[in-house]
Amino acid sequence: MDTPGSLQVIAIISLLLVGGASQPATFLEKALPTDGPSLETIEHKTEMVNTTRSEEQSPVRPSKTRQQLIDETPEICANAWVIRLITEFPTELGNMSQKQKTIAIQVHNTTMTMEETVFSLVSHVNKKNYEIHNVSGICTKYQLVPGNFTCSTRKCISQTKEKRIISTTVKDTYEVYLPFAWSQKPTGGDKYPEPQIGYNTGTGRLNQWNKDEFVIKQCRKKRGKRQITVPNSTLSPTGTTDFTKFTPNPISPNSTALNELEQKTTPIGTEQPFNNEKWQNLIFGNIVTKMDPQCEAELFQQFNISDKTVQVEFKVTSLPGQNISCQAIYNTEHGINIENKNCVISLIKENRKIKAHAYITRTGSYEWYAQQVTSKGIIQEVRNLVTIVECECPIVKPLPQGGIIPLTMPMRVLTNPSPILIHSALKFDLSKFGLSPCSFSPMEWQTYITKPLKRAMHGFEVHQRKKRDLGIGLHSTLNSWWNGANSLGLTVESADRQKYDQKILKVLQNLAVQQRTDVKNQQTLGKALETPIYTITLQLADSLTAAILKHEQQQNVGITCKDIAILTVTQIATYLRDIQHEHLPVWFIEQITNQILLPVGQVIMPEITAPPILNPLIGWNQSVLVIGLTHQLTITTVQQPLYKAANMGNFQDWTPFPPFILANKTHGFSIDCPIMRNSFLCHTLPTPVKLSEWERSTSTIYQTSPQVWITPEGKACLNHRNITVQDRTCLINKPGCFIPKHPWSAGKQTIVPTQYIQQNFVPDTIDTEDNQTRVLQKEMIEAISKAKRDYGVLKQGQIALIRHHEAITTILGQEATYSIKETQALISSIEQEAWYNNLFSWYDGSVWSQLQLIIVVITCTIPLLWVLNTCLFFKLRRAIRRERDNNIVVEYQAQTRGRRTHMTEPITKKQRAKLLRHAKTNRRLPRSLRATPAVSAFEMVTFDPQEETVEINRIDPSHENNDHGGPMNMAPIISADSYALPTPYITIMLDRELLNQGMRKVITLLNDPAREVFNKAYNLVTTNHFTLAYGCDESAGWVNQHAEYMGKPVIVTLAGLVITPVGLAWIPLPQQEPLEKLFMVPNSMPHVTVAMADYHETKEMGKIVKDINNEELLLVKPQLFKWGPEGFFVACPLVIRGVVTGHSLLHIACPATAVQAEGT
């Protein structure tokens, strides 16, 4: 440590608040670690001062008197204490081992019976640089608490939670100011104890510093309204901006909140219990991020605001002087005010979001600070440290001839688009409405269904001359929707039909292979479509349910089938008018590509030349409402990444100059393709031309028009005399080329760095703030697992549909047809062959069929057995007739529009078992169990809605929209009559979509150990809810006490997710009304079960959450905590709306005797 140098100290200070022993332990108070991070985490950043001294100079020692040092100590905190320490770094450091290289500056209270550390500044040693990492305070009688202060050029400005520590280092001598405050005043005649300061090298003993090396000073108490002085604003007409009204915590002087704020400057007593505000401080703990040095920085920060938000502030300050370079403040009372001086900042408010962008180009060190203040104080703080360095001026090399002007980054190119239709089905359980049987005449169907739907969907119709149907039959009629739910159908449209047929039939073959796999796994058709069906179902179900509830409320009469028809058509049509192509996310389309096994080099994307939804189909019977949707997508071929550019010079064979070209480093061609989802979508690509063949004579262009372009070697070339970066200009003596390392400006053009041009461009498929691809894929797998549990094994009719689809696909793959007529003729021949196959389907491998086969062979040579053969033939024919009547026989009738099909009686139990056994083993079916390859269909009256449908989710009519501006996915609102019979459950049903959004954030915060525990619970809970009461008697008692809450909305604030090997559960903030008041489940705590591990039940989760509350909570990384021996906790605050309901989760009610007993 003899080498002179500078020391940069970054201190992250955490002052731990622990309640006194006299009060009972509250929620999480027991779990609070005594040696971990505090509940009020404050982050400090030191101001570095570089000084040097000679090798011969002795360490700096205080030469002034103690009183002079006290007087010179700055007033950096109001109503608190400050320690000023000037000393050498301990010499024992050199003798310490690598594991012991930690030094603690400790403040001890010598007046106590036991010597306890009340303030420690822990620093870790890395070579010759000492970085202060953590400050914590622990004491039982006199506790250190954070003061409300800040320090700027040695001038105190009282501020809510912003703090600084000044550290000046000179070799191994340093000066540190440590602010602190006592948690309570001394009782009786006691005085404040004078702490002693020392260091601990890991040996366990305290080495004290000489008193001449430090002073302890009590700061004067300051009062008055707090304000911030900032540079003049460019927005004010007078040149100055009054920022006094934009305070970090703007409160009216006459309000009671001001008195509460002043009380916060007084140390908090140890007897104060753990409360919500401290819990939120844990959740929204400050995070300091140090960014890599760069030439220029573009900073971004976004906050979600609420009705309680008072002010949001963003600012960039230069270091070490803390001068404000630019600042933007949004205040709910005074609006937006922006100040730009040495950087540029912009502020955008969209709905409930505040977004800020700051652009810095001047060299130096800066702090990017953002905070949100609510009526309860600061709830969010973000700090980023960034250093701007000077960019190097380029050295140009001789300028070549020709080139192009780059306009975009390299982007993916997609060619040869061919349409593909993806079908999905949506079902509603109408039995929940208690409807009488519905019966429609053809005239009523036309009046209430066909005509309104046609008028509403007129803009989505496809021109018939361009439409070509391969005849797969999965999208022709409502019946096909009924049977082909969750299935995949294809329709082709192309000018070159023969060429396209050959390509698309290959896709159909691969689709058949995938469907065979689905049968083997006992999954429904179209496995890749289950998750998007679920998403679309939520949207349409909300619209449908909201319309029906609104109608019920207005009419106050029993709803009829015609009402459902009109409202359904109107709401769905209105919704589909505004739907956009982005309703299908890129990750979903990629999953479709993987599931149907597209050839290498082909992808699926939305169709930009047609509406995304075509011809919705709607139908219902007494118990089920079915909606069929057709999504139009495009299959394209992926080419290498190219970038769009403007032509400089011209190609030899092209006249006139093409205005735009697509090019890579070596070739280019003239075309102007539209951009969709960060890709160029081109119908065809011309033959590319080498860039080396550009016109050589370009001297005229050089003289008359300054240009910037890219050479075939990937260099940036220009004929400008100068280029600009940051706030300075680099002079260029002559035109030339160079390899850019940073963004540069030349005239109106920007030089793109070659490292960006030469690398492959990866389109941004997910939210730019956080890549959630892996999370969404996991959700898809979970949705598939849920579908398996809900639907179980396939019905016989669905298996027949798969076999038929496979047969037609295979035959069509062998013969490419040229027209619709030929395709229909081919399918008709297939149907005819199927009839013959059914006639000769007597051989199924049984003993009788084997015996008849032997007899047939023998009868060819032995005529004497003809009589026996005739007898057996008549016997087998009767068996065939019975077997055929019980088999899945489907008849096909060709019509001009669609197909009309029906299904005969179901097969026997014995045949059904044999059919399922063959489906599981993926073996070829016996002929006796094969269905005719016609379009299988269920009659609507035979459909069982209890097995394969989802019930309609209703919402509270008084709350039609949630915070996101759309209808909510709420629990069913039970009628008043249903409350007369109590159910075993009283719950708060929650919005699953919001919980899913929170889950996506949680997963990004997990480390490997937490993720391993997280993955153990994969059995999802179908309904997300708080259980308030359980049991018939308990539920009845709950209703008697809290009847006014039944059916009403409740706002709940979730604190985060508890992760245990048994299961996952959200837990709310403690002491939250009215949840604490309504919760009446013994031996449990309020929680929302999300998923459970195998061999565990949901009822276990309440005890698990209650038991883990007694464990310690240890910080792993920001927002992730170790809780208990195997559990974890992820802090993820989420405000969610629920509805209190007595709806039985298991669709059961309490016995009538319990109701009578309650009534008596």
From Swiss-Prot:
Disordered: annotated span: 230-251
Modification after translation: Specific enzymatic cleavages in vivo yield mature proteins. Envelope glycoproteins are synthesized as an inactive precursor that is N-glycosylated and processed likely by host cell furin or by a furin-like protease in the Golgi to yield the mature SU and TM proteins. The cleavage site between SU and TM requires the minimal sequence [KR]-X-[KR]-R.
Signal sequence segment: 1-22
Spans within the Extracellular topological domain: 23-853, 1070-1127
Annotated keywords: Cleavage on pair of basic residues, Coiled coil, Fusion of virus membrane with host cell membrane, Fusion of virus membrane with host membrane, Glycoprotein, Host cell membrane, Host membrane, Host-virus interaction, Lipoprotein, Membrane, Signal, Transmembrane, Transmembrane helix, Viral attachment to host cell, Viral envelope protein, Viral penetration into host cytoplasm, Virion, Virus entry into host cell
Glycan-carrying positions: 50, 95, 109, 134, 148, 232, 254, 304, 323, 621, 664, 722, 771
GO biological process, one term: symbiont entry into host cell
Cytoplasmic-side segments: 875-1048, 1149-1160
Name the record gives this protein: Envelope glycoprotein
